[in-house]
Regions:
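Catalytic cores and adjacent flexible loops of soluble metabolic enzymes
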Residues: 1-224
Length: 224
């Protein structure tokens, strides 16, 4: 049984602790720290986490909103402090500015070395195929941006990825990951083609490309 304390920030950490102990006493297994307005700063959130951990054995979860673009960061903070449940959604779909992005958080956890039983590229495809078409405005979670951040791939090389992935009919996301694993400082078309050929042999099949807007990436942005 979980209790969701909406607008947790509206009460002090001490009051939150008292309420948590009360609901735990009457049967709740877990309490949620809830950033309903998406305005909790990490150090503020951590006050609620620490007072609960130091004064009880009650499990906790976190539900964040992204009004100040901190929902994923705050989710990571709670995970590092032992949270049992983190609320997330594909494309960060949710009220107001939305919730923590499932896609982004998965790749953040992978960057931190977590071994996850999930195919992140399939997750991105599901999000693009089923969630984005339902949204009234374009999704905030762009696959190429996530992959670039995860792989530490500089976006000025996107024209190379665009050209080579089209030439070899490869998913640009997979090509970015493979190229960046080999080279981060100076990505050439020759290198990308060499890696693309190896990917093609490994896959033994054509990969359907999504319609990515490569034109929004500035070619010479490293010159600035």
């Amino acid at each position: 049984v979980a209790v969701n304390f909406m607008k947790s920030y509206a009460s002090s950490p001490v009051t939150f602790l008292k309420a948590s102990k009360f609901v735990n006493k009457i049967g709740a297994d877990l309490v949620y720290i809830v950033d309903s307005a998406g305005g909790m700063l990490p150090h503020e959130l951590n006050q609620y986490v620490q007072i609960l951990k130091k004064n009880s054995n009650i499990h906790f979860g976190f539900h964040g909103h992204d009004n100040l673009t901190l929902s994923n960061f705050n989710s990571l903070l709670c995970i590092s402090e032992g949270a049992k449940i983190i609320d997330i959604s594909l494309q960060g779909l949710g009220r107001s500015a939305g919730n923590a992005s499932f896609e982004t958080l998965i790749f953040l956890l992978m960057r931190y070395g977590f071994k996850l039983k999930i195919d992140p590229l399939k997750l991105l495809k599901i999000s693009e195929k089923y969630i984005i078409p339902l949204m009234s405005s374009p999704g905030k979670t762009k696959s190429l941006d996530i992959i670039s951040g995860y792989s530490q791939f500089h976006s000025s090389y996107m024209p190379v990825i665009d050209e080579v992935s089209n030439k070899f009919n490869l998913d640009p996301k997979e090509l970015i990951i493979a190229v960046s694993a080999k080279e981060k400082s100076h990505v050439t078309k020759e290198l990308a083609q060499k890696i693309a050929k190896k990917l093609k042999k490994l896959k033994k099949r054509n990969l359907t490309q999504n319609n990515y807007n490569f034109k929004r990436y500035v070619v010479n942005e490293q010159d600035n």
